[in-house]
Amino acid sequence: MSKTFIIEAVMLAVHGQLMLPGQPVTYIIPYTSIQELYELQAGSEPIMLEEEDDGFVKQMIGELITFFEESFNKKKIEKALVAPWRKSPPLPINENVTLMVVLAIDTEAYGEHFDPIETELILSSMKEQAPILTDQFDLIERLIQAEIPVQAFDVEDFEFAVEGDNQV
């Protein structure tokens, strides 16, 4: 059975290990985080501290954008965009990784403490009963402080999250 995580699209470009899990995983990605890829690719601000890493991550972002824009994948994603909280059909990446895009709606329920994409991650996690996978330790801290009823894993604990019985 596939393990499900809620993530931002950029995580797939920054953390290559997410594309090579030891067992099947499904990543549910809010559509707005796919839109954010275009901003990150076009922006002059570095994503990574090291120039070489930054160039590589921007190349990976370009590959992700190309993947999402492929005709077949684009049609699947468009199916999710017809109604709030609708998910796309599965977009297989490899034998162990499948993506699904969700049209998450930021209801501003957590707007005081979280930005719109973070809010979409939270609401998607609640709706799907799946943990958030992030590299933002401060997000995990804020989730705990605000007592948000979701499970979240740091990307450094990815293997533990995949192997364990950690479903919410």
Please report, for each region that a protein language model flagged, where it lies by residue.
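Active-site-proximal, substrate-binding regions of enzyme catalytic domains
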Residues: 4-128, 137-145, 151-152, 156-162
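Conserved SAM-binding loop
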Residues: 132-133
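A charged, well-structured terminal subsegment
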Residues: 163-168
